[in-house]
Each structure stands twice: as C-alpha cells, then as structure tokens.
C-alpha cells in the first residue's frame, strides 16, 4: 500500500515542481514576439511619453550628458537649428530603445506569471484525487517517524524559515519576486517585509506547536523544546 501511494505521490511532486518552470519558459518564448510587435506598433503612434521623457532625462544625468545638452541649447539659440546634434539624437534613440525594452520586460513577465498561476491553479483543481493521495502519503510518512526525528525536522524547518540567518534569505526571495515580475526595487518594502514576515511566520509556527501539535503528540513537543533549548 505504501509503495502504491509513494510512486504517484512522487510523480505528482515532480509534476508540480516542473510545471511552473516549463510553463514560464514556453510562454516566454511564445509571447515575446507578439508582445514586442504590439508594443512597437503602439509606440510608433507617439514619439515620447511624459514618463519616457523623465526617465531619459534621468539617464542623461547619470551619464553626465548635461554639458552636451547645454551646448545643444546654446547652439540652438545662436543658429535656430531645429534638429539636435547627431550624437545627441542617436543617444536619445538608444535611450528610447532601452526604455522600451524595460517596458517589454515588465509586460512579458507579468503576463507569463498570470498565465502560469492560472494553469497551476487549474491543475490543482483538476487533480484533486492526486492531491489527496499526495497529502495522505506525506502525513503517513511523517507520522511513521519516531518523535526524535519529527522534532529534528520541525526544528530544522523553523530555523530555516524564521531563524537568525533567515532574514537574508527572505530578502533574496522578495528581490527575486520583484525581479521576476519586472518591478523596480523598493528598499522600503524590502525592509518592512524582512522585518515583519518572519515574525508573523514565527508566531504561526509557535501557535501550531503549542496548540495543535501538543494535542497530537505531547511527547513530541517535550522533545522539541528540549532540543531547541539545548
């Protein structure tokens, strides 16, 4: 009976792990060309939006091109030339292309993540039977362990997610999420998340240990506290 449950459960676990990666890779390739054509067609209607102009000016400042802009303005006042110098014109075109690539990156990743989430949710809904088998197999595997090993695994998981060094890991996670979604980094949100989320998670784990696990196996709770206080 255990072997019959183990094989489908392991296959289901592999499926759940590989599905998001496969969907993300496939739709990235499929949607990239379509979104690029749509965005370029849309952008051809206008030269520069206010947001693009602001970003381009900021990048000029970063590239220390203010002196070139001043020269262009002085030259325009003297000669009333309507077109900017060729070098500045090329730089503007290059910055517009970079700005468009940033927008494409955000739209592509956001669309891919929405589709991936929808497919993953649909797979959970359509595979309720496999999910029940997997859940029962995990519970059976965990309950068959002796209390010392159970306490070790619980302590390992809690220290991994809410331990002293876990804040660095959560910071990497939130930065990866922002990068994957194509959002601009926000240090304030990163700090708030790293300071608050591990505390909330630690409270939930303690509640589970004291109130839920204590009812199922009081001896396990005693061993857990003995190991954690050692």
Curated annotation (Swiss-Prot):
Places the protein is found: Plastid, Chloroplast inner membrane
The name this protein goes by in its record: Potassium/proton antiporter CemA
Family to which this protein belongs: Belongs to the CemA family.
Keyword Ion transport in annotation: yes
Keyword Ion transport appears in the UniProt entry: yes
A single MF term (Gene Ontology): antiporter activity
Signal peptide: none
UniProt cross-references to InterPro entries, sorted A to Z: CemA (IPR004282)
Main location as per UniProt: plastid
Catalyses which reaction(s): K(+)(in) + H(+)(out) = K(+)(out) + H(+)(in)
Membrane topology (UniProt): Multi-pass membrane protein
Entry keyword set: Antiport, Chloroplast, Hydrogen ion transport, Ion transport, Membrane, Plastid, Plastid inner membrane, Potassium, Potassium transport, Transmembrane, Transmembrane helix, Transport
Pfam family, one: CemA
């Amino acid at each position: 009976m255990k072997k019959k449950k183990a094989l489908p459960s392991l296959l289901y676990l592999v499926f759940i792990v590989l599905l998001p990666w496969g969907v993300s890779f496939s739709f990235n390739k499929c949607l990239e060309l379509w979104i690029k054509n749509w965005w370029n067609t849309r952008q051809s209607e206008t030269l520069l939006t206010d947001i693009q102009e602001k970003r381009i000016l900021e990048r000029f400042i970063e590239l220390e091109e203010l002196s070139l802009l001043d020269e262009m303005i002085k030259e325009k006042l003297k000669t009333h030339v309507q077109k900017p110098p060729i070098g500045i014109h090329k730089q503007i075109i290059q910055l517009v292309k970079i700005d468009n690539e940033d927008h494409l990156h955000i739209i592509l990743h956001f669309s891919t993540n929405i589709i991936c989430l929808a497919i993953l949710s649909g797979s959970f809904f359509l595979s309720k039977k496999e999910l029940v088998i997997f859940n029962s197999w995990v519970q059976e595997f965990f309950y068959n362990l002796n209390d010392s090993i159970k306490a070790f695994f619980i302590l390992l998981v809690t220290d991994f997610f809410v331990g002293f060094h876990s804040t660095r890991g959560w910071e990497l996670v939130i930065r990866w999420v922002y990068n994957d979604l194509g959002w601009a980094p926000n240090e304030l949100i990163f700090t708030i998340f790293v300071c608050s989320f591990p505390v909330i998670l630690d409270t939930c784990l303690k509640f589970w240990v004291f109130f839920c696990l204590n009812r199922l196996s009081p001896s396990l709770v005693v061993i857990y506290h003995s190991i954690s206080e050692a």
